[in-house]
Amino acid sequence: MSTKRVLAAVSGGVDSSVAVHLLRQQGYEVEGVILEFSPAHRAAVESARVIAEQMKMPLHVIECHREFEENVILPFCREYREGRTPNPCILCNPSTKFALICKAAAELGFDFVATGHYARVEHQSGGTAVLRKSDCLERDQSYMLYRLTQQQLSMLLLPLEGLGKT
């Protein structure tokens, strides 16, 4: 049986690094991916490169300036002008972040995608993937992922699902 491949979203931070470590411990072959949302995001990309090098992990960088502007910035500004305060991450996750990461994973031959979010995906009989709260309720981030599609959820591994953050 071949080793399953995971494309893990990394930020250069602790949570995504721990997620990569846990996936490797579980026997997955892991490569990293980071989205460059704008030129101002280049420092985060460089931070992720340093971490990826330290972890001896290939890193894929997806430049998505246009998608981020169209799917997140412009809708955020429209909502804000209407007196609402939208959460940009909730706008970004299904339309940009996970859409692009899942697309890249499929094109590059990965079996799964992963992030360092604190939430759970439950795979039910019949193939339905259901988003659930993290076992660590004080760190739960399921609300950030509630708009993901079935396709996105079915590909998603969340290795931090049962961990607390100290």
What name fits each language-model region?
Residues 154:
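Short, glycine-/aromatic-enriched active-site segment of Class I SAM-dependent methyltransferases
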Residues 1-147, 157, 163-166:
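ATP-dependent adenylation/nucleotidyltransferase module used to activate substrates
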Residues 150:
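Gly-rich Lys/Arg/Thr-decorated short loops/hinges at beta-loop-alpha junctions or inter-strand turns
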